Amino acid sequence: MKSTETTYKKDNMGLTPSQIVNELNRFIVGQDKAKKAVAIALRNRYRRKRVEGNLRNEIVPKNILMIGSTGVGKTEIARRLAKLTNSPFYKIEATKFTEVGYVGRDVESIIRDLVEIAVNTEKALAKIAVDINAREKAIERILDSLVGKTSSSETREKFKAKVLNGELDDTEIEISVADTTPVGGGGFEIPCIPGASMGVLNLGDMIGRALGNSKTKTKKMLIKDAMTVIIPEESEKLIDQEKIIQKAINLAENDGIVFIDEIDKIASTSNAGAKNAEISREGVQRDLLPLIEGTTVNTKYGPVKTDHILFIASGAFHIAKPSDLLPELQGRLPIRVELNLLTKDDMIKILLEPETSLIKQYSALIGTEEVHLEFTDAAIEKIADYAITVNLEVEDIGARRLHTILENLLEDISFEASEMKVKKIIIDDKFVENQLSKIITNLDLAKFVL
């Protein structure tokens, strides 16, 4: 069956704003203003790359502040945008950080983690490019162990054919592989001085690099298992690590997207509690300022400039207001988008319309047991009704409420599906009511169950 997922390529960076919105519409319901804002931000990156001369360096991304309750699509919009363009994407909650000088994570770890993601992305692409050569070299190593290095070419070809067609998968061989056990156990980490740019150093990594990481050990394993170990080893030898790091840093600097959630939780409010907490929250905001405006962060891969990284901050702002953020931080998030609360119609669309909708997901899961689920329109409407009711009466968690409702609705079917003789189940409004009405009408119970 042909996959409905888009093949995400870097070429997608050249998509027009309307094309970007259309792609987002495949997975996300509503929130047109937010989609439009991120589509323009992404297109401006493409435009900037086409600007010639020194002016290109002066054009910086217009960072975005998304305002909206949980479960309305803030994170999903940013995540899908990054996936669409294969951009390094890093999501973090603002509450995870402490002010420089205090124990805890400092904000510069955002960039270190973003670069790590970029390096892993580039390394995966490089391994795909050398996969054929790596596989050939892996087979040669297995043949050395199987028939010896001095065996004739005829013998090697004969056994190579058997390895390739899987005849020898369960044959045990003795082969030398890289010893991946970290030096000294690898569990000893040295925290740097608070606020230092390098974060945490692993002593095992440092010693391993000093020794050249060339330690090997002989292991007995089946040929099919040996292939899964040796191919990555050979790939590592074939790829240019320095080139990968350079490309990864460039990718992070020019295409990276950082999503900072719960930024409202570090805003100072007039009715806030302890004064020390206020100072700490304001300190985190001040630490974020240079990062968002543009600075250079030292990482284990080298210095990384943040000038052209797109920052998307978000928060519900139920208690604090955007104006409670430091004025300097507000100025560095010039584009503000308010996301709408989800209506009953939105809930129905979320259940049905996206390519990876919840109904399709649950139907596919139960379908693996050869049980076909069929939802009537009345059932979908009833599920949406219950989701809105519980969100209003208990706590509004947006579309995430649909997950808990569907889990409770289909609990018995999920448990019994593997042993069911019935191969088709129709979920109608009566079924939904029978399964959920007792929970919905008892709000005290709903608080715990839904």
Swiss-Prot record:
Main location: cytoplasm
InterPro entries, alphabetized: AAA+_ATPase, ATP-dep_Clp_protease_ClpX, ATPase_AAA_core, Clp_ATPase_C, HslU, MCM_dom, P-loop_NTPase
Source superkingdom: Bacteria
Alphabetized UniProt keyword annotations: ATP-binding, Chaperone, Cytoplasm, Nucleotide-binding
Assigned GO CC terms: HslUV protease complex
Binding site for ATP: 29, 71-76, 261, 328, 400
GO molecular function: ATP binding; ATP hydrolysis activity; DNA binding; peptidase activity; proteasome-activating activity
Biological process annotations from GO: protein unfolding; proteolysis involved in protein catabolic process
A Pfam family per the record: MCM
Subcellular location as annotated: Cytoplasm
PANTHER family named in the record: ATP-DEPENDENT CLP PROTEASE ATP-BINDING SUBUNIT CLPX-LIKE, MITOCHONDRIAL-RELATED, ATP-DEPENDENT PROTEASE ATPASE SUBUNIT HSLU
Assembly, per entry: A double ring-shaped homohexamer of HslV is capped on each side by a ring-shaped HslU homohexamer. The assembly of the HslU/HslV complex is dependent on binding of ATP.
Family in the record: Belongs to the ClpX chaperone family. HslU subfamily.
Function: ATPase subunit of a proteasome-like degradation complex; this subunit has chaperone activity. The binding of ATP and its subsequent hydrolysis by HslU are essential for unfolding of protein substrates subsequently hydrolyzed by HslV. HslU recognizes the N-terminal part of its protein substrates and unfolds these before they are guided to HslV for hydrolysis.
Protein name per UniProt: ATP-dependent protease ATPase subunit HslU
Organism: Rickettsia prowazekii (strain Madrid E)
